[in-house]
């Protein structure tokens, strides 16, 4: 782990000494468990102006919260989600589904809900309850389908700001996200510089590389070429382009894992005892990818996949400044924690260092941690003692600032 910063260091000693003791929040479950959570559907009647020039008139956002908002509303943390995640950040739903960042958020965890009020928002265009392609169009009553407008990271941030308004939160203690969520956190610091104290960007990038855009295009092509796609209006045909979604997920999943991790998990292990000279599954890694693809195709929406990957492609805050990221971040007022993982080749550490350099060029306070974890891009979702210690120590600093 390497620290590069313009403010007092979060050192290994800080991380080791960060308070890990928390009282049990609810009797009858582990002290660090949030327990059962119930999401809330927020409706917004006021039209949301989109970057593409159109509007969404009347929309819903699914929201989930953890912890207690303090009297001056200074302890709120917004968690922004990645491609296939949702508002369900932590805790457990009634059907048993555990939040996607439950190891990070909760009582006594790095983002301690005994001290912080944490908000998860499902983005517009997603398929987990917020208004998206599966939702009925207000004029026709039929699903939006392909008529749902193309949305961007900036549109999501504007919608999230309305959620903050609904809670009466003028300034977040922190906005945090991993991968695509990290792009949203960065966008928050640029679009609403007075509305967050800290910006936490994990396993992310200030813009996609040509290679990443290419991966997204191949994945979208798999969906668009599926005969069951029907131009995006497959709902009316009572079908789903599962074959395309399956391939798209398989492509994506390869980019989330490191070569080292895949070698350790699968190597060249065969599915059966010997090769069968067929085009069916022969290797364990093939079986794994097919399983992941099949599972994803059952619960995710194809139109949503197209929208979110395109939002990834479009994100480039430096574009309006002649390609200069240094100029793009000049006006931000937040302090930053930027974390990358050495084996992440989807959003390589070089991209995080690019952001760190731009921030330091402007003398903005930034702490940088580069973690030597073997799990590739997915490392941001997994437990790693060094990674979690760094995040814990940073949030300890935030808690001291706001008196949480």
Curated annotation (Swiss-Prot):
The record marks 346 as: Important for acyl-CoA specificity. Keywords: Acyltransferase, Amino-acid biosynthesis, Cytoplasm, Methionine biosynthesis, Transferase. It is found in: Cytoplasm. The active site is at residues 179, 344, 377. Residues 1-25 have a biased composition (Low complexity). GO terms for molecular function: homoserine O-acetyltransferase activity; homoserine O-succinyltransferase activity. Homodimer. This is Homoserine O-succinyltransferase. It comes from Ralstonia pickettii (strain 12J).
